[in-house]
C-alpha cells in the first residue's frame, strides 16, 4: 500500500519505518527542511533502539520518502496518518492547532481515489469528527475519503518492538471500508483486532494512558511506604502483581 505520515516526531517516524519495513511505500511529511535532510541521511533524529537500522534499510530499499511537500505524497496515498503533537495548553487542554491545520492542508491535496485519514495523535473525544468536517469543507469535490482513529500504544525504549509486536490494534470508524483498509495494512502484525466506534477509539487511548499513570503513581506511593517501614518494594509489587485482577 502507499501511505503517508504527517509528522516525523516520536510516533510518526517509528510507525512509518515499521510500515515501510513491512513492504509499503511510505511518505513522511515534515515542516523543517533541516530535519528532512537528516532523516534522508539515515539519522532518525530521536534515539530509539533499532530505529536507525530499520530507517537505513528502508531508505536503501526506497520504501520510505521524506518531504515537506504535501502534493508529493497525499494525492497517491491510500491511507494518511496524522501524527503531529497535541501539547497541553496552560489550562491543561490539548492544543489541537497543528491537528486542524494539517487536516486542512491534507484536504486540499486529496486525489480522485478513495483515501482513509487516520489519527495517530492523542486527541480528545470528538476531535476526529471535527477533522472530518474540516476535510469535507476544503477537499476537491471529487475526492472520496473516510476518517478513522487508530491510536498508538508505544513505550519509549521499546517503541520499535512495540510497533512490530503490538498487544492489540484498535480501529475506530463509522466506515466499514476504512476499517477494512486499516486491517489490511496491519495484517502482517500480531495482536488482537479491536473494531470500535470512532469515539470509543479516542477514549481507549486516553483511558490506557490514565491507567498506566495511575499504576506508576501507586507504585511510587508503595515505594515510599516500603522505605518508611523496612519492606522490600520489589517483593511487595511482585506479591501484589501476581493477582490476575491487578497484574505487575
Where are these regions (language model features)?
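Structural/interface elements that position substrates and couple domains in central-metabolism enzymes
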Residues: 1-248
